[in-house]
């Protein structure tokens, strides 16, 4: 995804935001890991988190735990429960766990049902561990990368609805998960239950749900957005075991077809390389 498109989507600071605790780290680098972890796991509430986790910070600083285990301690903490568990519906809590711990939105009803059943059978800690000790987490973050929002770009195993769904959960860096329009209710329940993609809409708040009229890439098509975009993609090679050269394809797409084109390319096994405004 190009920088200009990421700016229009208000996600420039989140795309490719990979913070890793490397060997021979400095104290400044460790502090960046702490700050990023608090922001990812707690969102806006992360501003108040650091003094609550002095013991966990000491364990990571002294090499007793990995970044993955540090994230686990945060997500199993009473503070995380106070922020997201006690005051939200169960499905909303699952949505937020996907967002905070795997950096994406849940794709379909089977993922929601799995976690509902897991919590009922094994409890809170097992629910948190199911994300952090999953093959997906290991492949994406390993032991020393802080989770980040991956759903804005093509990722292995991603379903096409994931791109739209993450925008329903991520409403801007300054937005709080607990102060969004929709309150404690699940954001994805209706679309997931109907197996439909979510519509990408501008960020809103309970106070100012309709105050913004700025025309951006996420402006609703009904506002008459007539811009065109150039989508560059690498062709897919579905249903074949033969090694072939994958060609680069270029599409000129109107705004209101952008999401559909994204989905069509991924259904054919392709990968989007760049999206730029047409001059």
From Swiss-Prot:
It is a peripheral membrane protein. Residues 226-278 form the CpcD-like domain. The keyword Membrane applies. It is found in: Cellular thylakoid membrane. Residues 2-178 form the PBS-linker domain. Rod linker protein, associated with phycoerythrocyanin. Linker polypeptides determine the state of aggregation and the location of the disk-shaped phycobiliprotein units within the phycobilisome and modulate their spectroscopic properties in order to mediate a directed and optimal energy transfer. This is Phycobilisome 34.5 kDa linker polypeptide, phycoerythrocyanin-associated, rod. It comes from Mastigocladus laminosus. The gene is pecC.
């Amino acid at each position: 995804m190009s920088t200009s498109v990421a700016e229009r989507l208000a996600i420039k600071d989140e795309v490719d935001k990979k913070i890793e605790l490397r060997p021979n780290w400095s104290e400044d680098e460790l502090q960046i890991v702490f700050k990023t972890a608090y922001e990812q796991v707690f969102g806006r509430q992360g501003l108040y988190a650091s003094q609550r986790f002095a013991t966990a910070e000491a364990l990571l600083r002294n090499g007793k735990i990995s970044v993955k285990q540090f994230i686990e301690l945060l997500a199993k903490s009473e503070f995380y429960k106070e922020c997201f568990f006690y005051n939200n519906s169960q499905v909303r809590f699952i949505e937020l766990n996907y967002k905070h711990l795997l950096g994406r939105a849940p794709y379909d009803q089977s993922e929601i049902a799995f976690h509902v059943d897991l919590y009922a059978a094994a409890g809170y800690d097992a629910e948190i561990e199911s994300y952090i000790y999953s093959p997906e987490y290991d492949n994406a973050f390993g032991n020393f990368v802080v989770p980040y929002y991956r759903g804005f770009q093509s990722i292995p195993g991603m379903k096409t609805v994931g791109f739209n769904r993450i925008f329903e959960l991520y409403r801007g860096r300054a937005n709080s998960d607990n102060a969004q329009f929709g309150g404690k209710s699940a954001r994805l329940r209706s679309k997931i239950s109907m197996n439909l993609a979510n519509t990408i809409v501008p960020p809103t708040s309970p106070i100012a749900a309709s105050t913004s009229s700025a025309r951006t890439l996420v402006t609703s098509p009904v506002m008459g957005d007539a811009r065109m975009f150039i989508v560059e993609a690498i062709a897919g090679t579905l249903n074949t075991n033969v090694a072939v050269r994958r060609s680069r394809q270029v599409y000129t797409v109107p705004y209101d077809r952008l999401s559909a084109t994204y989905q069509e390319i991924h259904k054919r096994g392709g990968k989007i390389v760049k999206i730029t405004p047409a001059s």
